Amino acid sequence: MSAPRTLYDKIWDDHVVNRDPDGTCLLYIDRHLVHEVTSPQAFEGLRIAGRPVHSPTRTLAVVDHNVPTTADRLEGIKNEESRIQVEALAQNAKEFGVEYYSERDKRQGIVHIVGPEQGFTLPGMTIVCGDSHTSTHGAFGALAHGIGTSEVEHVLATQTLIQKKAKNMLVRVDGKLPESVTAKDIILAIIGEIGTAGGTGHVIEFAGEAIRSLSMEGRMTVCNMTIEGGARAGLIAPDETTFDYIKDKPRAPKGETLEQAIAYWKTLKSDEGAHYDKVVILDAANLPPIVSWGSSPEDVTSVEGIVPNPDDIEEENKRTSKWRALDYMGLKPGTRITDIAIDRVFIGSCTNGRIEDLRAAAKIVDGRKVASTVSAMIVPGSGLVKEQAEKEGLDKIFLDAGFEWREPGCSMCLAMNDDRLKPGERCASTSNRNFEGRQGYKSRTHLVSPAMAAAAAIAGHFVDVREWQ
């Protein structure tokens, strides 16, 4: 009888083409997502070598990082480097026979939102992209992670990837989530608990009652930020919630094929007694809304809390690092989180740019006005998200409140397009990284949920969203 296996073990074993004595494996890759920033050199490598794309139907190209999100974006991209990258992706996709969603296509959006909503992402698959937040797709019970540009070329050419297997880690979130506490709060709390190196060398499986209670969109938020916890990838075993989400998607299996697929997908769960190299358990019942205060995703606290004092940290290097973070963020120890005033609000990104995220924000915003001291923007994660939001009248709620309503793209998550903070500006952001300069030179980023960001836009400072329900 074979030893019990984890979900990660099962997907890995199913995709090993060759295994060397030192543990190095050649893995078959089911899906390859491509965007404009990490693909130009890869396609050029194919061109020079005279190689075709091995499996065009298993490859999907989407423009997202550099595209403007303003209404006039079809007039062109002003930044020359960004424009060249976008034009190169369009040309490469055409030349190599890869399906491509341009900024003129309503299916266009952030690659990690587009994949799932098209049914390109399915349980049990191996999925890669030249982007660190590819872990998002693990919400479907897929093994998904980012790769470098040379690896992008390797996958384009061979539909395989050379890898060594990571260790297994289980993060179990028990209990029921309190009202107004979200998937974003769960993952920020997890990173606060394990640190940004806590998952290094591991693939994390998320489990427990709180995880199971999440919608697919919530699960994608959790898996999206696995990389911020240091892990290679994050996984959630598929269930009826997963199957219900998938079945109506354009590229999903249909009819009898779907029934056969679901029968297989139901086997994609960890066996009882499977070994994990590391286990972390959290209690969801005690989770509050979370706000980041520093320049690392592990720098988090409750909205009810205060900015911590780095002098309380024993380890010298970490203490020095946290003092640097406070200096960069312009904060002092002991400051109440709810006393921190903000200048900007960004609701969007591959972490929180889906329809449920916009609904949560609209619920807070409805009938209220953005503070006079705040500039706020909503950037739907895809054209289809934008279309659905407009059908529901969410755009009107945001516009009436004083938010900007933008076109889809990565936007202010990262300073690679025109949406960026000015030096010293402080932003309540639903994105995934608060590094120095992430949203612009000397930008100050606080990571929060969509509801928390929306409430901060109205109040002009952080507030406990639980008091607004």
Swiss-Prot record:
Protein's UniProt name: 3-isopropylmalate dehydratase large subunit
Gene designation per UniProt: leuC
HAMAP family, alphabetized: LeuC_type1 (MF_01026)
Matching PANTHER family: 3-ISOPROPYLMALATE DEHYDRATASE, HOMOACONITASE, MITOCHONDRIAL-RELATED
Binding site for [4Fe-4S] cluster: C350, C410, C413
Top enzyme category: lyase
Cofactor: [4Fe-4S] cluster
Keyword Iron-sulfur: yes
Role noted for this protein: Catalyzes the isomerization between 2-isopropylmalate and 3-isopropylmalate, via the formation of 2-isopropylmaleate.
MF term (GO), any: metal ion binding
Record has 4Fe-4S as a keyword: yes
Family label: Belongs to the aconitase/IPM isomerase family. LeuC type 1 subfamily.
Entry EC number(s): 4.2.1.33
Subunit: Heterodimer of LeuC and LeuD.
InterPro entries for this protein: 3-IsopropMal_deHydase_lsu, Acnase/IPM_dHydase_lsu_aba_1/3, Acoase/IPM_deHydtase_lsu_aba, Aconitase_4Fe-4S_BS, Aconitase_4Fe-4S_dom, IPM_dehydratase_rel_enz, IPMI_cat
Co-factor binding comment: Binds 1 [4Fe-4S] cluster per subunit.
Reactions this protein catalyses: (2R,3S)-3-isopropylmalate = (2S)-2-isopropylmalate
Pathway assigned in UniProt: Amino-acid biosynthesis; L-leucine biosynthesis; L-leucine from 3-methyl-2-oxobutanoate: step 2/4
GO biological process terms held by the UniProt record: L-leucine biosynthetic process
This protein's UniProt keywords: 4Fe-4S, Amino-acid biosynthesis, Branched-chain amino acid biosynthesis, Iron, Iron-sulfur, Leucine biosynthesis, Lyase, Metal-binding
Species annotation: Agrobacterium fabrum (strain C58 / ATCC 33970) (Agrobacterium tumefaciens (strain C58))
